[in-house]
A protein has these predicted regions:
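Extended, polar beta-sheet/loop recognition surfaces of beta-rich domains
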Residues: 48-52, 110-125
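N-terminal signal peptide c-region/cleavage motif recognized by signal peptidases
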Residues: 22-24
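A glycine-anchored, Pro-Gly-centered beta-turn/N-cap motif
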Residues: 92, 97-106
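Bacterial N-terminal signal peptides
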Residues: 12-20
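N-terminal edge beta-strand
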Residues: 26-45
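Short strand-edge motifs at loop-to-beta-strand transitions and within beta-strands
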Residues: 87-91
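Short, surface-exposed alpha-helix to beta-strand junction/turn motifs within ectodomains of secreted
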Residues: 50, 55-77
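Bacterial N-terminal signal peptides that target proteins for export
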Residues: 2-11
């Protein structure tokens, strides 16, 4: 009988932990929001593009680049993880003409998970 109780306790502990496991497996840095917002239309060049993630990023392995409407890389755009908020990726943006632009990002969270994606915005005059 004394051997059965510890087994039951272990079984109960496992059953209680099961609902938590999917959340642990899904602990990647996801894009929480951006400025400018995805699919937005702007009247002029934004001073910078900001991408906020759900987890802190590894600065050495996280970055982004800007593409124009022809999917060519825009010179002068440079991305870096913010020195104060490690979940924020900031991109300086050169003067841009009217058109559609795509921010392509690839970030590594501090727990080493890779997340990649893109978002677009449009500039009108």
């Amino acid at each position: 009988m004394s051997c059965i109780r510890p087994r039951r306790l272990v079984l109960v502990a496992i059953l209680l932990a099961l609902p938590v496991l999917p959340g642990l497996a899904d602990a990647h840095a996801k894009l929480a929001r951006s400025d400018p917002p995805a699919s937005s239309t702007l009247r002029g060049t934004p001073p910078e593009v900001k991408l906020w993630f759900t987890e802190s990023l590894e600065p050495s392995f996280s970055g982004a680049h800007l593409l124009d409407g022809e999917r060519r890389r825009v010179d002068g755009a440079a991305a870096r993880v913010d020195a104060v908020d490690a979940a924020l990726l900031r991109m300086t943006v050169p003067a841009l003409g009217p058109g559609r632009y795509t921010v392509v990002y690839r970030v590594v969270s501090v727990d080493s998970h890779v997340t990649a994606g893109e978002l677009t915005f449009r500039i009108v005059r």
